[in-house]
Design a protein with these regions (language model features):
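Oxidoreductase cofactor-interface core, primarily capturing Rossmann-like NAD(P)-dependent enzymes
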Residues: 50-151
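Conserved internal alpha-helix in NAD(P)-dependent oxidoreductase domains
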Residues: 22-23, 38, 62
C-alpha cells in the first residue's frame, strides 16, 4: 500500500516533488517486487495522465505507467478527487476552497469531482490489497464518493 506524496509548495521545487511522488514510489515498489511482493496498491490522483500538460497529473501518470512496467501480479491504482481528511497542520487555501464548495454543492457536482473521504480511500486500498485480483485495476473517484458516510 502506498500513499506517499507531497506538494510542489511543500517540497520546494518541481524536481523535489518529482523525487518524492515518482522516484521514491518507484524505488519502494521495485524493492517490494524484488522481495517477492505480488501486489501493489497506489493512491494516485484523478486525472493522472502521462500526456497531461499539468505537471502534477503528468508525474502521477508517469508513475502509474512505471508501476505497470514492474509486472506486479496485481496492481491497483486508486484515483481520488480532492481528499477530505479533516484539518491539516499546514494551510492549503485552494484545497480549503475546493472542500468548502464541494461539500456545500455536493449534489450539483458530478460524482467524479466530489471531495473524497480519506477513510473511503483507505478502505478501497485495503480491500484491493486483500483481494489481490490479478491484473491492473483502476478505482476512479466516482466509485469512492459512493462510500462517503459508510467509511
Amino acid at each position: 500500500l502506498c500513499a506517499l506524496g507531497t506538494t510542489i509548495k511543500q517540497s520546494g521545487s518541481r524536481a523535489a516533488f518529482r523525487e518524492v511522488d515518482y522516484t521514491f514510489v518507484v524505488n519502494a515498489a521495485t524493492l517490494a517486487k524484488n522481495a517477492g511482493c505480488p501486489n501493489f496498491v497506489l493512491n494516485s490522483s484523478l486525472g493522472a495522465d502521462a500526456g497531461s500538460g499539468n505537471f502534477y497529473l503528468k508525474v502521477k501518470g508517469e508513475l502509474e505507467s512505471a508501476l505497470q512496467g514492474l509486472g506486479f501480479a496485481s496492481l491497483t491504482l486508486v484515483r481520488p478527487s480532492l481528499l477530505d481528511g479533516g484539518p491539516r497542520p499546514e494551510r492549503r487555501f485552494g484545497e480549503e476552497i475546493g472542500l468548502w464548495f464541494g461539500t456545500r454543492l455536493r449534489g450539483l457536482i458530478p460524482a467524479r469531482y466530489r471531495p473524497v473521504s480519506t477513510k473511503a480511500v483507505a478502505q478501497a486500498m485495503l480491500e484491493a490489497a486483500l483481494a489481490s485480483k490479478p491484473g491492473v485495476h483502476v478505482i476512479e473517484s466516482e466509485s469512492l464518493t459512493q462510500s462517503i458516510g459508510k467509511a
